[in-house]
């Protein structure tokens, strides 16, 4: 939700792009006229060898700021030296986003990038951003740099593809995951503004999803059919969705989300002492679980769910509980390509001693317990292969979370019944 790649990887009709590594690689799976990729630091260089043997006059090449700082500038230098016609789209999202949001290896900002590529002979250079007014008047840009709003990206690209030689677009928009983390630490501006959808007006056309490519725009089933709603807990306030031609969107400024009441509590959410005491009594009344015997063999737990919802945290809590109880444990988190929004599996193995744990991964048919935080991930091929008939017990969350397929297909239906039947 709110990822800058949602907009930055688009290309105008009649053009194509070459993929970069990391998050840029995922554009290959999307309908973004993007093909081929290279190792880190060679983004776009395939065009150097291809250009003389095709009638195609121009391509775009995607590259991230982390890759650019590491070795990507060398690829741009090679392209400029070969005098091919191409435009590098350098995404400055202010983080090494895919691997955990680390900072760059050294100091880097859009102005520095502009001066470096200009020194290599790249021109023109256009900065495209969601906040054109954020740059101080004395920003040390390379000569001739212009700044445009991201709403003009299509027009900027149409202009660039007519330019001879190597040109560059520096797309400046902070990584959505990093925005979220920094806002929690009060280290990034958090506008008092939210977009909501009036379901009575919404016709369920899905144009908001087309414009934003955002997973926070979710289906809402009503008596009048499927509508749209914005999941405010996952929204990162990108506001690309409001650019659609739709009267159902309402922008609320200055308001705050209403916090749900706690069970037995009052409007302040604090609850009364009596209610808290009652909750503690109910918790004590719960039957104690039957703990598995770890004397003979390890106990395998597989936690499945969606990245960013606490799957890894659940695995860590189980491991720490085993450690506190004096047992051995291991945890292996399989978070895939992206840390948020994708399938995540946490392999937890518990044993009487370290000598009994021969592998950190739960083997084929070796799961004694599956904690399915998301039913679709629990029914995936990888997760199913860890389950064994007569051995595995599964506890699965029935709440349905839309997938990326809904963004492309407004009539997409969640395969919940099929997933449960498979399990």
Predicted regions, residues:
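Active-site cofactor/cluster-binding pocket
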Residues: 108-111, 115-116, 121-124, 251, ...
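Glycine/aspartate-rich loop-and-adjacent alpha/beta segment that forms the canonical ThDP
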Residues: 142-149, 155-213
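Thiamine diphosphate
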Residues: 1-167, 260, 267, 284, ...
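Short acidic, glycine/serine/threonine-rich loops at helix termini
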Residues: 11-13, 21, 27-33, 71-75, ...
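Extended, hydrophobic alpha-helical segments in both membrane/secreted and soluble proteins
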Residues: 39, 43-50, 56-82, 86-89, ...
């Amino acid at each position: 939700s709110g990822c800058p790649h949602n907009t930055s990887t688009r290309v105008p009709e009649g053009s194509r792009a070459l993929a970069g590594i990391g998050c840029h690689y995922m554009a290959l799976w999307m309908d973004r006229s993007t093909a081929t990729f290279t190792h880190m630091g060679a983004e776009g260089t395939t065009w150097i060898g291809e250009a003389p043997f095709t009638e195609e006059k121009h391509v775009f090449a995607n590259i991230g700021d982390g890759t650019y700082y590491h070795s990507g500038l060398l690829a741009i230098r090679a392209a400029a030296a070969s005098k091919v016609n191409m435009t590098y789209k350098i995404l400055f999202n202010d983080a090494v986003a895919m691997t955990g949001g680390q900072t760059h290896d050294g100091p880097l900002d859009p102005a520095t990038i502009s001066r470096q590529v200009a020194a290599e002979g790249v021109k023109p250079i256009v900065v495209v951003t969601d906040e054109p007014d954020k740059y101080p008047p004395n920003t040390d840009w390379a000569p001739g740099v212009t700044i445009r709003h991201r709403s003009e990206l299509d027009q900027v690209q149409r202009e660039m593809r007519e330019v001879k030689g190597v040109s560059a677009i520096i797309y400046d928009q902070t990584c959505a995951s990093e925005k979220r983390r920094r806002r929690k630490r009060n280290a990034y501006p958090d506008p008092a503004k939210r977009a909501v959808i009036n379901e009575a007006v919404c016709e369920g056309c899905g144009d908001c999803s087309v414009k934003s490519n955002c997973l926070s725009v979710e289906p809402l089933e009503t008596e009048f059919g499927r509508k749209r709603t914005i999941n405010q807990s996952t929204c990162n306030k990108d506001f690309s969705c409001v650019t659609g031609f739709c009267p159902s969107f309402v922008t609320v400024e200055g308001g705050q989300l209403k916090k749900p009441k706690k069970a037995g509590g009052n409007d302040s959410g604090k609850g009364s002492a009596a209610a808290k005491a009652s909750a503690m009594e109910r918790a004590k009344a719960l039957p104690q679980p039957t703990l598995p015997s770890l004397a003979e063999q390890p106990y395998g737990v597989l936690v499945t769910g969606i990245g960013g919802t606490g799957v890894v945290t659940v695995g860590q809590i189980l491991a720490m509980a085993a450690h506190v109880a004096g047992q051995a444990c291991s945890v292996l988190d399989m978070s895939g390509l992206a840390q948020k929004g994708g399938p995540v599996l946490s392999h937890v193995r518990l044993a009487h001693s370290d000598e009994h744990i021969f592998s950190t991964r739960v083997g084929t048919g070796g799961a004694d317990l599956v904690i399915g935080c998301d039913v679709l991930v629990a029914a995936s091929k990888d997760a199913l292969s860890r389950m064994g008939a007569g051995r595995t017990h599964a506890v699965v969350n029935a709440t349905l979370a839309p997938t990326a397929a809904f963004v492309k297909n407004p009539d997409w239906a969640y395969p919940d019944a099929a997933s449960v039947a498979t399990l």
